[in-house]
């Protein structure tokens, strides 16, 4: 396990395994390192895989004062703790954290951004209110399912698959972190001008069956970052690392190691 102390004194940890160049994975909202284990197990022959637990999860600490900027700083602090350059893979909210952290660290080797969440319509915050009411009434499973279905747009089939996975209990424990991330994202202002300075190779993954909102955000980021490209994950949605881990891992290896399977 790797751990660092972020700027506000919060301890942030990563679980790691494998051999090869370092690959740092930044998970999205409602998940932790367990969520990525399916895909990570298929990457460890090629990379030393580090899966970050963002603040408020597993062995990572938390802080009573939350801000989205602290999330960015956490990822940057992890990156800066490596002696070598690092491949980075960020998903959804973690994709945004990865994007912002790449402006704060100088050792990013290459980026994969899987449907980075760069916006949340403030008109939809009423959905966040509903989720919070479920959490306040001690219904974490109902709250998590509501988030997945009504806010993210994950299919009923994918939700039922998620419920039978061994990490479901951990996801329920972290459900209280979801509303703060949604509200922070709703007030976040995406600055295209800032990201035009990114020069490391950048690939955006998008599910062929993902909601249009994610496809739109991918297109916006791709138009911003010079020489970036988009790879469509055919037949997949927002969570291909769970629904098709073999295919997903193969695409990561092809992207980062340039077809050296």
What are these regions (language model features)?
Residues 123-124, 139-179, 186:
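Conserved alpha/beta-hydrolase catalytic His-Asp/Glu region
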Residues 41, 50-89, 93, 250:
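Active-site loop/oxyanion-hole signature of alpha/beta-hydrolase fold enzymes
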Residues 25-28, 92, 207:
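Glycine-rich His-Gly loop
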Residues 6-61:
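Conserved HGGG/HGGXW glycine-rich cap/lid loop of the alpha/beta-hydrolase fold
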